[in-house]
Amino acid sequence: MIAAHCLRCGVALVDRHDGERTRRTCPACGWVFYDNPLPVVAAIVEHEGAVILVRNHGWPEKMFALVTGFLERDETPEAGVLREVREELGLEGEVVSLIGVYDFTMRNELIVAFHVRATGTIVLGAELADHRRVAKEKLRPWPLGTGLAVRDWLARQT
């Protein structure tokens, strides 16, 4: 998200070069919009012997990915990933392990990925159009974003 106006005084921000980067800055009070990456949690969800991939509304018909979501204020990454699994799949989960932390610079996000074991009956949340069950041996990583977490998790399975 790019800020257009100062959060302190409401004046329109301007681009100002600070020697290293160009940043959105308030010409009236000097406030700087740093546009820091947003923390996102991601889950490789194991449920009844398969990995669950999901498809959001608006995504292409064959595009599936991991359960993901933005970390909330005052929430640990572990609590956030379990909340996302509950909200998106209706499942209760337990964090098995941290898989890794991945930059996703094209979306200005920092992904914190976990392996989660889940139980219960899948009930898709409002954000999701579909889900797919994939056997571990058939799961294939994709070259960016959460696909890197899939790659690293699969490497640890053998």
Q: What label would you give each PLM region?
A:
Residues G69, R83, V96, V134-E137:
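Structural detector for helix-capping/boundary residues
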Residues R16-H17, E92-G100:
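A short coil-to-beta-strand element that immediately follows conserved catalytic motifs
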Residues M1-A42:
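Acidic, metal-coordinating catalytic segment for phosphate/diphosphate chemistry
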Residues G100-L124, R132, K136:
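Active-site-adjacent beta-strand/loop module that shapes the phosphate/pyrophosphate-binding cleft
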